[in-house]
Amino acid sequence: MTPLSAVATPTPAPAEAADSRFSNTFLRLKKKLERGVGKAIADFNMIGDGDTVMVCVSGGKDSYTLLSCLLALRERAPVDFRIIAMNLDQKQPGFPAEVLPAYFESIGVEYRIVTEDTYSIVKDKIPEGKTTCSLCSRLRRGIIYRVARELGATRIALGHHRDDMLETLFLNLFFGGKIKAMPPKLVSDNGEHVVIRPLAYCTEADIAKFARTMEFPIIPCNLCGSQENAQRKQIKTMLQGWAREHPGRIESIATALGQVVPSHLADASLFDFRNLTRDTLVAEGDIAFDRAELPPASAAVMPTVMQLTDHRTDGK
């Protein structure tokens, strides 16, 4: 196990004049992302005064964007919190170990680089051609928790975004038999660590646009040679198709994650159906025989709806 080096504290970078060379379109996108991150932090009480936030930075577009937004928000936040960027070098072949330290130095953020050869462990345990992501993720999580403890971090920030949350929802629904997504905030099983996902309201498309304009030094995520899980790939393709063909559908599903009605599902651990009697009042009201009130379909969706209606009518 490689011993940890001290946290590096670079000289703060001068205030960037970069915004002046960006288009108004980009500045609106930047503001949109920062507003989304700020709203998620407020909605789920992710960061408080005096917190030390360890931001896990892999070298991908999502974690770069997360770090950028948190640094920007810290400048005007009503609470004071510390940010430490952390990268885990898992000794994957071809990993450019010099990229992230140079980037962290250039923006003046505290950082910690941790080196652990999990790549060799994974390759030894997983047969060739099989997806290594699950074992790799477990090993990485254990190291992240350990480093957070050593740094005294009170929050661990991950770069998962809204699309990741929705993909996880449908993966569990279609292949796991559960209505379960990816929470914006959680506590580790041992109760020691609080994990937050400040990009919970941000879309992958917006993040990708932001990262391209910022010209982050992206490190490829496939250095290990592992392929994306086939099931997740199916879900991603499905959601991308819905986004193209049914405007508003993805937004509606995302909204639904925060509007769960346990009394109208079938999980007895969430709602006490067994002791439900005539005298029991349910907060959601008596709508057992009511049709759900739905918003009117958008103009883009109406032709499809009409075709389906005509088809059903013709088939009677």
Curated annotation (Swiss-Prot):
Instruction: Please state where this protein is localized.
Output: Cytoplasm
A GO cellular component annotation here is: cytoplasm
Which molecular function GO terms apply here?
A: 4 iron, 4 sulfur cluster binding; ATP binding; magnesium ion binding; sulfurtransferase activity; tRNA binding
Residues bound to [4Fe-4S] cluster are 133, 136, 224
Pfam (any one): ATP_bind_3
Give start-end ranges for motif PP-loop motif: 58-63
Q: Could you state one GO biological process linked to this protein?
A: tRNA thio-modification
What pathway is it annotated to? Answer: tRNA modification
Which InterPro entries does this UniProt record tie to the protein? Rossmann-like_a/b/a_fold, TilS/TtcA_N, tRNA_Cyd_32_2_STrfase
**Reaction catalysis annotation:** cytidine(32) in tRNA + S-sulfanyl-L-cysteinyl-[cysteine desulfurase] + AH2 + ATP = 2-thiocytidine(32) in tRNA + L-cysteinyl-[cysteine desulfurase] + A + AMP + diphosphate + H(+)
What coarse category fits the chief subcellular location reported for this protein?
cytoplasm
> Which Gene3D superfamilies does the record cross-reference, listed alphabetically?
HUPs
Which PANTHER family does its entry note?
AMINOTRAN_5 DOMAIN-CONTAINING PROTEIN (PTHR43686:SF1), SULFURTRANSFERASE-RELATED (PTHR43686)
**Summary of subunit composition and partner proteins:** Homodimer.
The record's similarity note reads: Belongs to the TtcA family.
HAMAP family of this UniProt entry? TtcA
Misc remark: The thiolation reaction likely consists of two steps: a first activation step by ATP to form an adenylated intermediate of the target base of tRNA, and a second nucleophilic substitution step of the sulfur (S) atom supplied by the hydrosulfide attached to the Fe-S cluster.
Please report the name of this protein according to its UniProt entry.
tRNA-cytidine(32) 2-sulfurtransferase
Q: Which organism is it from?
A: Aromatoleum aromaticum (strain DSM 19018 / LMG 30748 / EbN1)
Please spell out the taxonomic lineage of the organism that makes this protein. Bacteria, Pseudomonadati, Pseudomonadota, Betaproteobacteria, Rhodocyclales
